[in-house]
Design a protein with these regions (language model features):
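Conserved glycine-rich cofactor-binding loop
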Residues: 9, 14-17
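Substrate-binding pocket helix/loop in short-chain dehydrogenase/reductase
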Residues: 71, 99-100, 104-112, 138, ...
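Active-site helix of classical SDR
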Residues: 123, 159, 167
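Residue(s) in the substrate-gating loop at a strand-loop-helix junction
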Residues: 143
Length: 262
């Protein structure tokens, strides 16, 4: 399917691996020019080269999105390089796990900075450019915890719900400017983050990591862990004109894990 993204410019954060990379790959396959950022410079530039092999232009910016001014710098560098900005995919790493009593105020602040405020700052920097051209796509990668809290991830559950509220509010404010805003909420996908959480669970439960992964699969109605590319495909669709009537929603990519109706 040709999604009509050739000539569009997409900025994707935390894109050197995992879900961010999967989003960047799908956008590149559809012909979009990319700006990607991540903290690890070596992995970032390796990803840049591989994405360029898919045919489009790729700007790589080694940045930590939590550092002051980096979200704005990332957007500025993207617009400076390409002269426009059409799509922003806001993606960051997951928060520290643990029950409520183990988290300090600083833990909550750190999670809010990384998982909520980076989304706020990327959107704030991007929206004026999108308004100017009368078209834009804001896509926030969060977690199914924005729909259904995950045990042991209380700081993340709190921040992810905030991003869902941000996106819904932006969808209402920006709808007359041709800008859509949506959340993509992954469940268990084949990423380093999933294996890290499985490793922590295995230690607490006294089982192996492989056994923890099998238990995780059994909790998913489809009885398997998803592929990052399956999320990337949805993001590419939401970034396209074909998704022009979809805004203000949160879509789970979770194999049916979330049991709620909404």
């Amino acid at each position: 399917m040709d999604l009509g993204l050739k000539g569009r410019v997409a900025a994707v954060s935390a894109a050197s691996k995992g879900l961010g990379r999967a989003c960047a790959e799908e956008l590149a396959r559809e012909g979009a020019d990319l700006a990607i950022c991540a903290r690890g410079e070596d992995a970032l530039h390796a990803t840049q080269k591989e994405l360029e092999e898919l045919g489009g232009r790729v700007l790589a910016a080694p940045l930590d999105m939590v550092e002051p001014g980096t979200c704005e710098r990332f957007i500025d560098e993207t617009v400076s390089a390409y002269g426009r900005l059409d799509i922003v995919v806001s993606n960051v790493g997951g928060p520290k796990a643990g029950p409520f009593e183990t988290h300090s105020d600083d833990d909550f602040r750190e999670t809010m900075e990384r998982n909520l405020m980076t989304a706020v700052r990327l959107a704030r920097a991007a929206v004026p450019h999108m308004k100017q051209q009368g078209w834009g796509r804001l896509i926030f990668i969060t977690s199914i915890s924005s729909k259904q809290p995950i045990e042991g991830l209380i700081t993340g559950n709190t921040a992810r719900a905030g991003v869902a509220g941000l996106s819904k509010s932006l969808s209402l404010e920006l709808v007359t400017h041709g800008i859509t805003s949506n959340v993509v909420a992954p469940g268990s996908l084949l990423t380093d983050r999933t294996y890290d959480l499985a490793s922590q669970f295995s230690k607490n439960a006294g089982i192996t990591v492989d056994e923890a992964i099998k238990r995780l699969e059994q909790d998913i109605p489809m009885k398997r862990i998803g592929k990052p590319a399956e999320l990337g495909a949805l993001v590419a669709f939401l970034a396209s004109e074909r998704a022009s009537f979809i805004t203000g929603t949160t879509i789970a990519v979770d194999g049916g894990t979330v049991r709620g109706l909404l």
